[in-house]
Amino acid sequence: MRTPAVSIIVPCHNGGRFLDGLVASVAAQTFRDFETIIVDDGSTDPATLEKLDALDPEIRVVHQENRYLPGARNRGFREARAAFVIPVDCDDRLEPSFLAETIEVLREAPPEVGFVFTHGRLTGALEGVMSRHFNPFDQLFLNQLPYGMLLRKSAWQSVGGYDETMRDGMEDWEFSIRLLRAGLRGIEIPKPLLIYNVSAEGMLMGHAARMHGTLWRHIRERHREIYRLAALLKIWRGSAPGKISLLEAAGLLGLAKLLPETWFNKLFYEALNRARRRRAERGDYRPDGGLRRNSNSAD
């Protein structure tokens, strides 16, 4: 069996209503040497199961019991035959040049570059362009990276995959910190080539957003060594100036120790909302990442 250059892996749990858009965007890719793997993560919705059964035979569908998003992504990576892998959700879409542009960069990059990512175009409850950047120091406090990035499969293997205990979200954030700790870095393509559907119940605005502080605390506990002062100073000195100052980082770490979890989580969530409102005020579809709420959304 021929080995493709890229594997596109798609976790799907009762998300059949979104698959037509994703499949159409995959079929429109200008780079053609890829395979598509959909991981049915214990779907129970009859319409989703019917949709999966009716897909083109060239799309490989693997079934498993519900292991949530990190477990489904790990299954997709294990099934992937290519050296380069992109995980996307079933309600996402890719611009036609996504694979062509990202694989060209990653193929030519040195081995320490483990991933390539693009900016995102948001649709649904939020609309606009979300800029994405990789600053190692900021990444310890803010989830800057999209989950939909082209990775070397060897990078996923080297850090042990996604943490399957993180069932409430932000597993991609914790995964990116392990990539950072492994000495891997990413390259940004400053174009919105990933189309990300935002729902009021989704990760960006829903449960995971409300638990942002709690999930960050989990990440910090898992990676205590990198959040110690000496390690933080080393990463801060090696990073370009970013969104988080050293003083702000120290303040967050101090508050996380002093405040009860519910208080800290509320503070963290409100800070994120203020930042989001500031971005929304900057306008719609702007290169600097302006966002606006879609009044026609179900939100």
Could you describe each region identified by the protein language model?
Residues 23-63:
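Acidic donor-binding segment of Leloir-type glycosyltransferases
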Residues 64-80:
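Glycine-rich, basic loop-to-helix element that forms the pyrophosphate-binding segment
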Residues 85:
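Short aromatic/hydrophobic "clamp" motif used to bind/position activated sugar donors
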